[in-house]
C-alpha cells in the first residue's frame, strides 16, 4: 500500500492501493505501444486505395484529423462522466473502444473502413485525459509534475517498443500491427477489470452534469475566460498545431523525402521514444531542482524551434542526418514541455474538477491536432516538404511570449464551476 497526503480541501489522508499505480502505469505503457505501433504503416495502408503521393499525403493527414475531431467532442464528455461516475468505468470502456478501433482499421477493405476505425478510436480516445485525472487523484499537487514526467517516461518506453515492433510485424502484412494493438489493449481491459481500484471516492465526485460540461465549445470558452489559465492554454494550442502536423506527415515525409520503409520508420520512432525516456526519466527531475514549471516549458519550446529548423534544413539539402538531429532536439523539447504543462494545469483545480480540466485540455489539444494535420497536409503538397517545419518555427516562436507573460494559475479556477 502507498500513502499520500490528500490534495482536497479537507486535507485528509488518502490511501492508494498499489494496483492504482500499477494499472495506471500499465495503461499508459500500453497506450504508448498501441498508438505508436501503427504509426509506421499508416501510409502503406492507404497506398492500395490511392496511388498519387500528393493525394495519399492528404488522406493520411485527414485520418489524423478525423481522430482528433472525435476526441475534441468526446474528451469533455468523458472527463465530466469520470468526475461523476468515477475513473474506473470510463477507462475500461475507452480502452475497449480503442481495441475495437484498431481492429476495424486493420480489417480495412475500403477507405471508408479506415476512417470508421479512426472515428471509433477518437470517440474513446479521451482515455488519456481520464488517466491523467486518475493520477492527479492519487498524487499530491506538489509532486505531480515529477510524477507526470515519470508517466510520460513510461509512455516513452511504450513508444520505444511500439514502432520497431510495428515495423517488424508489417513484414507479415500491414494490418498485423493493428491486430496486435487490439490484443494488447484488450489485455489491459482484462487486467483493469479485475485489479484496477477506483481513484475518486464518492464524496469527492461531481453531484450533477450540466450541458455546459458536455459542450466542448462552452468548455473552451469557460477555460479561456480564465485570465490566469488562458495564456497557458493558448500557448499550448499554438505549439500543438505544428506538432500535430509533424506527427501526421512524419511517415509520409520520410517515405517521400528519404525513401524510408516501415522498418526504418519504426526504428526512428523507437529511437525518439528512447530519447523520451532519457529526457523525462533522468533530465526532467534534475531540471525541476533548478527551474519551475514555466521555465521548463519555455526551454522545451525553444528546443522545438531549433529542432524544426534542422528538420527544414534536412529537407532543403536532402540530408537525413540533419533530420535525425532535428528530431532529437525537437523530441527533447516536447518531452519536457508535456509534464511541465500538465503540472501547471493539474495544480489549478481540486480533485472533483481534474477530469473536467484534463478533458477540456485534451479538447483543445484535439482541436489543434485536427487543424494541424489539415494545414500541414495542404502546405506539404503545395509548398514543399519543408513547409510544416517552417510553420512550427513560426507558431512556437509566437507562443513563447504568450506563455512567458502568464500569471499564476493557482488562484481562481473556482469561477468555472
Residues of each region from the PLM?
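Helix-to-loop junctions at the C-terminal end of transmembrane segments
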Residues: 74-86, 279-293, 380
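C-terminal ends and interior cores of transmembrane alpha-helices
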Residues: 96-109, 303-317
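A membrane-interface helix-boundary motif in multi-pass transporters
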Residues: 170-183, 378-396
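Juxtamembrane intracellular "pre-TM" segments in multi-pass secondary transporters
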Residues: 5-18, 197-235, 257
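Short amphipathic helix-loop junctions that connect adjacent transmembrane helices
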Residues: 41-57, 248-265
